[in-house]
């Protein structure tokens, strides 16, 4: 029976793609921190979870942003980075600009969470934060080049987590986990290439082939990174 009403006013966004706009409303709780360059980072969930279950993800998010800023040589583009665990969410996570949404399993970490699940949470957060530059700050003219967004992000999630948690040796997983599926899928007659022409919006959802756009595309990017060397590759990304 609440009768309060109000008008919410938001700051004007930078120029952005409409598919990256999100709103979240609910009875939420959260933890916050600030990066060394002053970006406000927050992780939120419903009150069904202890507040301490958000600490791991907050730490990963802060350090991931700081890593990407150093690696790309480009500051995080907007004032805040909020991460929300949703009780019911069809996607794994979505890189809405400044308001990333997740399934709870990819953001909430409790004392019984396995090491593997913690690694997965870190990779998903790093993936969505990579998109804040690849896909959000720099967006393709059309969906034909979706693979660039997802391939970069899929590779960079491993580069990032390997840098902030070197003892995990996470890049060993990158070099093996997605390769068999990508090779098998790529050998199928009529399989799509990483770059697919899109003539109608109804075709967009067909592009999200995990074995091709994510696994194969990210390995192609890694081949380029190894061929150029990490320093020159990073310089190229800065120009990009």
Which residues make up each language-model segment?
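Hydrophobic alpha-helical and helix-loop surface patches within well-folded domains
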Residues: 10, 42-240
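Non-catalytic architectural context of zinc metalloproteases
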Residues: 1-59, 79
């Amino acid at each position: 029976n609440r009768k309060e009403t109000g008008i919410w006013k938001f700051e004007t966004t930078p120029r952005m793609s409409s598919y990256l706009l999100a709103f979240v409303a609910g009875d939420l709780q959260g933890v916050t921190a600030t990066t060394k360059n002053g970006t406000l980072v927050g992780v939120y969930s419903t009150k069904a979870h202890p507040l301490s279950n958000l600490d791991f993800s907050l730490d990963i998010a802060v350090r991931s942003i700081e890593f990407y800023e150093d690696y790309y040589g480009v500051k995080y583009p907007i004032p805040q980075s909020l991460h929300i665990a949703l009780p019911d969410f069809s996607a794994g996570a979505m890189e809405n600009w400044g308001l990333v949404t997740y399934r709870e399993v990819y953001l909430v970490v409790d004392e019984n969470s396995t090491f593997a699940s913690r690694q997965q949470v870190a990779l998903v957060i790093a993936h969505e934060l990579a998109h804040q530059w690849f896909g959000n700050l720099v967006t393709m003219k059309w969906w034909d080049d979706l693979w660039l967004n997802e391939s970069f992000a899929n590779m960079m999630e491993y580069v990032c987590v390997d840098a902030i948690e070197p003892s995990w040796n996470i890049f060993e997983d990158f070099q093996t986990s997605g390769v068999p599926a990508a090779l098998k899928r790529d050998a199928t007659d009529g399989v799509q290439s990483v770059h697919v022409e899109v003539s109608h919006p109804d075709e967009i959802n067909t592009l999200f082939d995990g074995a091709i756009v994510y696994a194969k595309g990210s390995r192609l990017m890694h081949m380029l990174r190894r061929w150029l060397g990490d320093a020159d590759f990073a310089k190229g990304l800065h120009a990009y």
